C-alpha cells in the first residue's frame, strides 16, 4: 500500500529514449549555400536554386525552386541598399570613428529577419506538413575561414501515430 501515491518516472525515461532514437535516425540536414557574387556580412545576394537530390520524394522540385526564388527576391530587394550603405560607411568610417557602419549592420539584421520570417511562413504553409524545417544558419565557408549564412533544410522526425498525446 506504500506504493499507492509514489510517482514513477519510467514513462518519461521511455519517452525521452524514443525521442532520442527518432533524432538519431533522421538524415543529415540539406545545406543550400549562397551562390551570388556579392556578400555583405556573410549574407550572399542569392542562394542556389538547384534541386538537391536528397530531397527527392520529399518535396516537388517546383515547390523548392519557388521557395528559393522567394528568398532570392527578398535578397534582391534588400541587398543593393545594404551595399550602397556599406560603401558609404567604409568611405566615412575614419571620420566617424566607425559610427557610419551602424546603418549597414542594422539593414543587414533587418534583411536576415525578413528572410527568417519568410522561411517561417514557408514552414507553416508547406514544409512542416512534409516533415521538413527550413532555417537560416551561420556556417563556416568551405573555401576559407570566414562565416556565411546558409539555408538548412532539416528533416523532422515523424511522431508515432500509435502513441496518444
UniProtKB/Swiss-Prot annotation:
Pfam families attached to this UniProt entry: Erf4 (PF10256)
Main location: membrane
Claim: Manganese is one of the keywords in the record: no
Cleavable signal peptide: none
Modification after translation (UniProt): Palmitoylation in the CHIC motif is required for membrane association.
Superkingdom, taxonomy of origin: Eukaryota
UniProt site (Breakpoint for translocation to form CHIC2-ETV6 in AML): 111-112
Alphabetically ordered keywords of this record: Cell membrane, Chromosomal rearrangement, Coiled coil, Cytoplasmic vesicle, Lipoprotein, Membrane, Palmitate
Entry's localization field: Cell membrane; Cytoplasmic vesicle
InterPro entries in the cross-refs: CHIC1/2, Golgin_A_7/ERF4
Entry GO terms, CC: Golgi apparatus; Golgi-associated vesicle; intracellular membrane-bounded organelle; plasma membrane
Coiled-coil residue windows: 1-26
Motif placement: CHIC motif (Cys-rich): 88-106
Disease: A chromosomal aberration involving CHIC2 is found in a form of acute myeloid leukemia (AML). Translocation t(4;12)(q12;p13) with ETV6.
Classification via PANTHER family: CYSTEINE-RICH HYDROPHOBIC DOMAIN PROTEIN BRAIN X-LINKED PROTEIN, CYSTEINE-RICH HYDROPHOBIC DOMAIN-CONTAINING PROTEIN 2
Protein family: Belongs to the CHIC family.
Identification of the protein by name: Cysteine-rich hydrophobic domain-containing protein 2
Organism: Homo sapiens
